[in-house]
Amino acid sequence: MQKEIYYTFDINNIKDKEFTKVFVDCPWEAIRNPTPIDESEHLQWLKDSNLFDCDQDAENFFKDKTYIMSSYINPLNPKDNIIWVIRMHDFIYIVDDFYFEKGLLGEEWVINMFDRDAPQDKIGKTFWNIIEGMEKTGNKKAVEQLLHDTKIWALSVFTYNKCNINSESSFEYYCKYRCLDVGMDFGLSTAKVFAEPLPKEVLESSTYKRIIFGYNQTHSLINDMVSFERERKESNRMANYVMVHAYKTNSVQESMYHCKQMVEGVFNEINVLCEQLKREFPDVSNLDFHLNLIKLVISGDNYVSNDTTYPRYNLNH
């Protein structure tokens, strides 16, 4: 008998519905950026940002304390730069949550926003104000890469919405879309926006590309494990690998453990690949710095994602 293929998720189709949260063991220590966050100043920026319809919406968003995640995945950014990075991250959260997910902004708007010479609406003006702050406090080439990665993420939202992920999709097919949608190329770009970029030959090497692919895989799976409960309650869309694999095993719990094992396996692979890359490019002076930063971004994301007190991922806050 041919196996039924599901394009939406309904936990009633899964035999094992009960599950406990599973935590990923990360081999690298998470470090929070030491720069203290002036909460009242940041809240006022949110209110003045032209990104919300009213101050109450800004206050409600502020309660998510997204700046905590930003501080952990941007641990080394200097004091004058981190404020712009946090604003950039919040800009992305807000545009995604309040505009993209509600279908209020589309691909044409994204293309226009990234054209610096084009007339901008109030949202675009806020974006370019942040970029100017980045340019004043960061590395020019790194800011250009950040712009590229941010645009790729923004456009990927619409590509991801069109993909047909289902209960029989392979992990490779899922990653093709999800690794862009989760936006961690953007996250890594902000973490190193103040630093001299790696040479082109390193960035284009197969080993470095495998490291970045693994980096994106870990973030996708960690995000899926953390957001599974919220996503299944908010939408029946098959947008999470925990959902996909649960249909393969008929168990949410087994799917959670499977994702945990996959992430921890990728951690080991990244360690091996980093050592291999250092052997391939022994004379690149900033290679160690960049490889360490990749690990710090992963560990920071994992740490905050598994912090049950982090408001954005806490369903009860």
UniProtKB/Swiss-Prot annotation:
Enzyme superclass (EC): lyase
Segments forming a coiled coil: none
Motif range (NDxxSxxxD/E motif): 223-231
Superkingdom classification of source: Eukaryota
GO molecular function annotations of the record: lyase activity; metal ion binding
Keywords: Lyase, Metal-binding
Catalytic activity, EC: 4.2.3.-
Family from the record: Belongs to the terpene synthase family.
UniProt free text on domains: Contains several highly conserved motifs that are important for catalytic activity including the aspartate-rich 'DDxx(x)D/E' motif and the 'NDxxSxxxD/E' motif, both of which are involved in complexing metal ions to coordinate the binding of the isoprenyl diphosphate substrate in the active site.
Purpose: Terpene synthase that converts its substrate farnesyl diphosphate (FPP) into the sesquiterpene CAS 137235-51-9 as a major product. Is also able to convert FPP into 9-epi-(E)-caryophyllene, alpha-neoclovene, beta-neoclovene, and 3 yet unidentified sesquiterpenes.
Protein name (Swiss-Prot/TrEMBL): Terpene synthase 3
Source organism of the structure: Dictyostelium purpureum (Slime mold)
Highest classification ranks of the organism: Eukaryota, Amoebozoa, Evosea, Eumycetozoa, Dictyostelia
